[in-house]
Amino acid sequence: GATGDLSARKLFPALFQLDAAGLLQDDLRIAAVGRQQQTVEAFRDELRLKMSRYMRQEMNTEVWHRFIERLDYLAADFAEPRAFGGLRGWLDDGRVSLFYLATPPSLFTTICEQLNDDRCLTGPCRIVLEKPIGESLETSSEVNETLGRFFAEQDIYRIDHYLGKETVQNLLVLRFANRFVNSQWDQSCIDHVQITVAEKVGIEGRWAYYDGVGQLRDMVQNHLMQLLCLVAMEPPNSLEAESIRDEKVKIVKALRPVDPATVKEHVVRGQYSQGVINGQAVPGYLEEEGCATSASD
C-alpha cells in the first residue's frame, strides 16, 4: 500500500522523522510496494509532494536525500502469481524483515499467501496490520488463521494508530498516575461519559475503500472502542502491555451487545453534507471524488 493515503499521511512521515532523529540504522532499507507502475524516481518525487502537505514540520533537504537513499519502489499486483518475486531479491535471510500491510483488509490473506509462495518469509520476519482486520467476525477469523500459518504470534503486530496519539497516551497517565483523579474516577463522581471524535477532513479520494468498509468498521470498532476501554477500565496491575490489554478485555466483555432487531433504537447514522471547514467550502459525502451510488445508504 505504498502509494495509498495511510502511507503518505502516517507511515513515511514517521519513518522520515525517525531518520531525522538518528534512530534508523545506517543500513536499514525500505522497500515500498504498490500496484502503480512507475519508476522509483517518480515514486520518490510524488511522495515528497504528499509528505510536504501532511507533515507539520518543514522537511530538511539533507535528511530527505539520506532518506530516499534507503527507499526503493516495486510495482506489484498482489493477486498475480509471483507478485513479490522482485521483492525476494531485496531480502536478506540473515536479517529481520518487517512487512507493513497498509492495504484494505480484503487483501491481507492474499498478500500473506503470496509472500509465502514467493519465498519472502524464509528468514526472520514480522508483520504489521492496520485496522480494520477483516470486515466481519468470519473474515477477521480467516485473517488471523492465515497469519498464524506463517507468523508466530509474537511477530504479529495489529496496529491501531490512535493509540499513538499523545492525548490518548496521556489518558493512562491522567487516570493512574494522578492520585486525586484516580480516586474520583468512578460512578459516584462521574454522571456519564461522551466520546466525540470531530474530524476536519472527509474521505478525501478514498471512496473505493471507505464506502465499502463504512464508518462503523473504520472508526468505531477500533479507535473509539480503544478510547472507551481506556476511559472505563480498572487500574491494571502494571503499565505493561499485557496488563493493560487484560483490563481492556474485561470492558469489552462487559459491554451490552446491540441486538440486530433493535439497532435503530440504539444507533444514529448519517452522511455528512456540504459545509465549510476553516473557511473553505467542502463537499458532502455524496459529492466526494469517486462517488458512485452509495453502498452504505
Give residue ranges: language-model regions.
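Secretory/organelle targeting and membrane-embedding segments
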Residues: 1-128, 133-297
